[in-house]
């Protein structure tokens, strides 16, 4: 069973061409290497207010229709503040295979066609329907959209606390896992969106939970052969068959990790109809890179000594940075943040920097200047002073004044209590 797992397209008009280039790459790969299932783990759009009559919206529908001509597609709604329930509109997409879009936790089985007329088609069915009609699904999928406090309060009538919600999530996961146990030797895939404890957002920084977070232990209670998740833009294998696909494009300058999608393969023994008789616990997962533009983040502090090499000005430093970036990356962009003294910032020509960088081969460039008052530096002496009298003296020196001894004496008395 081959699954293409992707997420976090974040389609938006300002980055339309870059996003479409990378998502088209996924579809082109699928045409050459047809999967048995597409799993899209949320955040297809960057805003639920994206107009349907935009090139981004049209691209989303076209891409999903193309996928549906190759394999069934399972989608969960992602971050509510981003796309809300807008993916539900994709239920209208049509192809040779059916689509499943979920905004609530639910389980479905995919029953493929078995006769000559229906050989390329199948149907998503609830597990209750499958058991009632005695069907044998090709695989089972548990859809876990990003959990929201509003959902649990409205649906479960429990207190709006993270602890209570975590308990409710435990109940859902355990229940889903128990139901799947009744389908022996049927591959079980989880498609989810949200925050998993221990996930990394960069090489060194762990994600800190600020909303509802699920643990690996909770996910393992689902008894799944594969857990596909979205929300974190850094692709990663978390162990125990749990994966974040990451985003197919770089969302921000400074994202240095590779971008792409996963191709997972679940192995097992099947009958003449392709139904699984037994499942091999070994899972093979390949990360396939997309041609995402490299977005470098350069920070120059003109207020500090050693910002540039001796005899080198700011423009030469920027050129050297661009030369290094262009050696390793064919397609690249750069964000340059320059910190300068407020009285010297006027000497920095942003338009000229942008022109030079584009001439050096950048696809895009953004230059911003942080203006730093010199008084800010002088006031650091006040902050560094240990005692109240010392702070008064430092403040007076900054203003070119002197402090009367009587005031200093009162300061000593105040500090002494």
For the regions a language model picked out, list residue spans one by one.
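Divalent metal-coordination and catalytic microenvironments
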Residues: 8, 38, 43, 60-63, ...
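Active-site environment of divalent metal-dependent phosphoester hydrolases
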Residues: 12-14, 46-49, 76-90, 108-111, ...
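Accessory, non-catalytic peripheral segments of nucleic-acid enzymes
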Residues: 267-417
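Conserved catalytic scaffold of divalent metal-dependent phosphoesterases
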Residues: 88-212
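Conserved beta-sheet core of the metallophosphoesterase superfamily
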Residues: 95, 196-198, 202-270
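Short, solvent-exposed loop/turn segments at secondary-structure boundaries
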Residues: 14-19, 49-54, 155, 202-204, ...
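Core catalytic region of metal-dependent phosphoesterases/phosphodiesterases
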Residues: 14-116, 121-126, 130, 216-224
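Extreme N-terminal starter segment of soluble prokaryotic enzymes
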Residues: 1-4
């Amino acid at each position: 069973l081959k699954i293409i797992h992707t997420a976090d397209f974040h389609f938006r008009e300002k980055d339309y061409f870059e996003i479409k280039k990378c998502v088209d790459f996924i579809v082109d790969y699928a045409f050459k290497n047809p999967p048995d299932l597409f799993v899209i783990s949320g955040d297809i759009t960057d805003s639920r207010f994206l107009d349907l009559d935009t090139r981004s919206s049209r691209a989303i529908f076209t891409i999903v229709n193309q996928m549906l001509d190759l394999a069934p597609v399972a989608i969960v709604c992602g971050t509510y503040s981003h796309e809300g329930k807008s993916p539900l509109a994709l239920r209208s997409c049509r192809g040779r295979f059916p689509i499943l879009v979920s905004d609530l936790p639910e389980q479905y089985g995919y029953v493929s066609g078995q006769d000559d007329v229906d050989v390329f088609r199948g149907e998503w069915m609830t597990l209750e329907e499958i058991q009632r009609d005695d069907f044998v699904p090709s695989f089972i999928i548990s859809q876990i959209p990003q959990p929201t406090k509003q959902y649990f309060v409205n649906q479960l009538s429990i207190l709006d606390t993270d602890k209570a919600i975590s308990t409710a999530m435990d109940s859902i996961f355990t229940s889903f896992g128990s139901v799947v146990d009744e389908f022996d030797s049927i591959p079980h895939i989880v498609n989810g969106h949200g925050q998993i404890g221990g996930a990394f957002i960069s090489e060194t920084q762990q994600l800190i939970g600020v909303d509802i977070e699920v643990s690996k232990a909770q996910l393992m209670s689902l008894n799944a052969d594969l857990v596909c998740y979205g929300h974190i833009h850094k692709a990663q294998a978390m162990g125990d068959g749990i994966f974040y696909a990451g985003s197919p494009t770089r969302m921000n300058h400074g994202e240095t990790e590779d971008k792409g999608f996963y191709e997972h393969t679940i192995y097992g023994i099947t009958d003449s109809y392709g139904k699984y008789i037994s499942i091999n616990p070994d899972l093979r997962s390949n990360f396939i890179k997309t041609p995402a533009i490299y977005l470098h983040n350069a920070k120059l502090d003109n207020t500090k000594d050693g910002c540039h090499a001796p005899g080198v000005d700011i423009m030469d430093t920027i050129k050297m940075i661009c030369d290094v970036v262009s050696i390793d990356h064919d397609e690249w962009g750069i964000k340059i943040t320059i910190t300068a003294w407020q009285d010297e910032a006027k000497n920095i020509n942003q338009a000229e920097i942008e022109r030079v960088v584009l001439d050096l081969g950048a696809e895009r460039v953004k230059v911003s200047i942080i203006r730093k008052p010199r008084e800010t530096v002088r006031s650091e002496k006040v902050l560094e002073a240990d005692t109240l009298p010392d702070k008064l003296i430092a403040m007076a020196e900054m203003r070119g004044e002197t402090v009367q001894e009587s005031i200093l004496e009162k300061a000593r008395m105040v500090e002494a209590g």
